[in-house]
Swiss-Prot record:
Family classification: Belongs to the copine family.
Effect after changing D99N: Does not inhibit calcium-dependent translocation to the cell membrane
Protein name: Copine-2
Superkingdom of the source species: Eukaryota
Keyword set, alphabetical order: Calcium, Cell membrane, Cytoplasm, Membrane, Metal-binding, Nucleus, Repeat
Organismal lineage: Eukaryota, Metazoa, Chordata, Craniata, Vertebrata
Pfam families per record: C2, Copine
Gene: Cpne2
Any GO MF annotation of the entry: metal ion binding
Binding site for Ca(2+) 2: D39, D97, D99, D109
PROSITE patterns assigned: C2
Length: 548
């Protein structure tokens, strides 16, 4: 049975659930019981997909792993969401039987779904509900259980493990070992926390290091027991038990690089039957590192300032500002699309800058007295002090400069990008997470210096800097989408790849009839992630942060 979510095919990647500077994150654990059996010769191979409602459309957020040949799966992959008390966050959990390796959901059999708000799950802590068909009628079989846990502890643990001389389980070959980690649940039963990858054809596996939130592994309690199970993978889902052991984070933390911790893997049945039994192999904990996974809010609370600069397009294609058809025409309500974009972004960002003094620059205009074209001028006509006091100051300087300049061209972005990048480069000399620069460019048309702009953006991607581009009017903004590296990483004309995606482009026309906060959410959606990504890459913790 094919499945297409309401509103069309899902969008890959995570959808930001509002602002990322919320108070807490919530982790959702999903399991299924008595699911429909869609396979003829074996049991279903279920996986769960989480959709989030965004502007009336269901958008794919994430997927669990596939539980092979299992009608009662407990998925080790968790869904981690930002929780906002003031918003109704609608969620849909859909279960599928994996038939092919395709990422397209209509290639898999639909097993059922359940929809509710995040608040419903959080207030109940754990809910169990019957699965429904797409028409909201009962699926006939199968229930879903969703448990919520607040991730208020931002510590994460990275474990690197290996095995030595594990029991051979395959008749004509060696074992295909993997590990499962469990913690005690509230109901007294062991709860699956993490499953490693399978290492094929070996009795001496080396697993990839993995990182999980400390609260997921042990509820933040370093002494809480952790059960580790070792299995030999079987493609039909009937994995062979190799052995087990119990440990704790406190014990595992004894392992350091160069000083591994070795733990015997015990099969209790073999131990009872054979007096000569020693173990079923050794699990080697090569390293255990606990560190903090800092959030955007951690950096803001740590004193990081968001340094905001506005760049405004004054090219002739905007039209004469005295003409009501001009994009720079200020209507009787005292606004236009340029001012709306400045207000939408600036009103939020100004709260994160203590002095609220923002440079406001223009490009593409001829300036008095000699009427030379400039692509990097202060709109208050004070090149030594281009700062405006708050968003109000930017709006006032913008309105005041319109009668005194001549709109011209071309539409060159690179001078303003390089202008802000120079200040961002100076900030890196401090080697602290105290400043992050945001450039808002508002423009009506096609970039003239695309080659130079690509190079400037690639260089800026190495700095504490993000670029927001708001396109006003009805021009073709295909080039802007190219700079916004959501689908593929931007490269300069020399072939150098951007260190990270720092450009967010939004066409204003999509928000003309929407609430003003809608534009702000869209424009600022990627910013918290970009801030964290930069400081994390540079190994810069928030100032005054506590050790893990």
């Amino acid at each position: 049975m094919a499945y297409i979510p309401d509103g069309g095919a899902p969008t890959a990647g995570a959808i930001p659930l509002g602002s990322q500077c919320c108070v807490c994150k919530v982790e959702l654990s999903v399991s299924g019981q008595n699911l429909l059996d869609r396979d003829v010769t074996s049991k279903s191979d279920p996986f769960c997909v989480l959709f989030i409602e965004d502007n009336g459309r269901w958008m794919e957020f994430d997927r669990t792993e596939t539980a092979v040949n299992n009608l009662n799966p407990a998925f080790s992959k968790k869904f981690v969401l930002d929780y906002h008390f003031e918003e109704v966050q609608k969620l849909k959990f859909a279960l599928f039987d994996q038939d092919k390796s395709s990422a397209q959901l209509d290639e898999h059999d639909f097993l059922g779904q359940f929809s509710c708000s995040l608040g419903t799950i959080v207030s109940s802590k754990k809910i169990t509900r019957p699965l429904l068909l797409m028409n909201d009628k009962p699926a006939g079989k199968g229930v879903i259980t969703i448990a919520a846990q607040e991730l208020s502890d931002n510590r994460v643990i990275t474990l690197s493990l290996a095995g030595r001389k594990l029991d051979k389980k395959d008749l004509f070959g060696k074992s295909d070992p993997f590990l499962e980690f469990y913690k005690p649940g509230d109901d007294g039963k062991w709860m699956l926390v993490h499953r490693t990858e399978v290492i094929k054809y070996t009795l001496d596996p080396v697993w990839k290091p993995f990182t999980v939130p400390l609260v997921s592994l042990c509820d933040g309690d370093l002494e809480k027991p952790i059960q580790v199970m070792c299995y030999d993978y079987d493609s039909n889902g009937g994995h062979d038990f190799i052995g087990e052991f119990q440990t704790s984070v406190l014990q595992m933390s004894e392992a350091r690089d160069g000083v591994p911790l070795e733990i015997e893997c015990i099969n209790p049945k073999k131990q009872r039957k054979k007096k000569s039994y020693k173990n079923s192999g050794i699990i080697i904990l090569r390293s255990c590192k606990i560190h903090r996974n800092y959030s955007f809010l951690d950096y803001i609370l740590g004193g990081c300032q968001l340094m905001f600069t506005v760049g405004i397009d004054f090219t002739a294609s905007n039209g004469n500002p005295l003409d009501p058809s001009s994009l720079h025409y200020i209507n009787p309500m005292g606004t236009n699309e340029y001012l709306s974009a400045i207000w939408a972004v600036g009103q939020i960002i100004q709260d994160y800058d203590s002095d609220k003094m923002f440079p406001a620059l223009g490009f593409g205009a001829q300036l008095p007295p000699d009427w030379k074209v400039s692509h990097e001028f202060a709109i208050n006509f004070n090149p030594t002090n281009p700062f405006c006091s708050g968003v109000d100051g930017i709006a006032q300087a913008y309105s005041a400069c319109l009668p005194h300049i001549r709109f011209y061209g071309p539409t060159n972005f690179s001078p303003i990008v390089n202008h802000v990048a120079r200040f961002a480069a100076q900030a890196t000399q401090q080697q602290t997470a105290t400043q992050y620069f945001i450039l808002l460019i508002i423009t009506d048309g096609v970039i003239s210096d695309m080659e130079e702009t690509r190079h400037a953006v690639v260089q800026a991607s190495k700095l504490p800097m993000s670029i927001i581009i708001v396109g006003v009017g009805n021009a073709d903004f295909a080039a802007m989408e190219f700079l916004d590296g959501d689908n593929r990483r931007l490269r300069s004309h020399t072939g150098e790849e951007a260190a990270r995606d720092i450009v967010q482009f939004v066409p204003f026309r999509e928000f003309r009839n929407a609430a003003k906060e809608t534009l702000a959410k869209a424009v600022l959606a990627e910013l918290p992630q970009q801030v964290v990504q930069y400081f994390k890459h540079k190994n810069l913790p928030p100032t005054n942060s506590e050790p893990a």
